[in-house]
Design a protein with these regions (language model features):
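Sec-dependent bacterial lipoprotein signal peptides
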Residues: 1-17
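Ser/Thr-rich, low-complexity intrinsically disordered terminal regions
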Residues: 20-149
């Protein structure tokens, strides 16, 4: 009985630690500045990091970037960063995975060879590649990262 319990606990721990595709994180940053100043600073940080702004709405304090592509070996992901400023800053990712669809020889070169699939999971290495530069820039500007996930 004790062996089974220990075995199950060990198995559960191994499964939990081996999860290479965790859910996409959501970041929260707290600030002590004026809300509109924070909103415009968030836009400037994204521009500084090379992102193009797609939606910019000062009325609702929300903005999003245009699609950006990131690769991991053969997999390609398109992602959008969404920022919402309330009493804190929320950073969200919307992710699509590009899947190469092997078709018949009659449709070689067809644009339908790549399927876009919306993802709620993404490799942690890619999430870090996206979020780390953002975290560094926000910390430089005096914002505090409090919550992840």
């Amino acid at each position: 009985m004790i062996f089974n319990k220990t075995f199950l606990q060990t198995l559960f721990l191994l499964l939990a630690l081996s999860c290479t595709y965790p859910p996409i994180e959501k970041k929260k940053l707290y600030y002590s500045k004026d809300k509109i100043e924070v909103f415009y600073q968030s836009r400037d940080i994204l521009k500084k990091l090379g992102y193009e702004i797609d939606i910019f709405s000062p009325e609702s304090f929300a903005l999003s970037t245009k699609k950006t592509q990131i690769k991991k070996s053969l997999r390609k992901y398109d992602y959008i960063i969404f920022i919402k400023v309330n009493d804190h800053i929320e950073l969200h990712l919307a992710v699509e995975r590009n899947i190469f669809n092997r078709g018949s020889e009659s449709n070689i070169g067809d644009s339908g060879m790549i399927i876009k699939q919306v993802e709620s999971y993404m490799p942690i290495a890619l999430q870090n590649k996206i979020f780390k530069p953002l975290e560094i820039e926000f910390k430089k500007n005096g914002y505090n990262l409090v919550v992840s996930r």
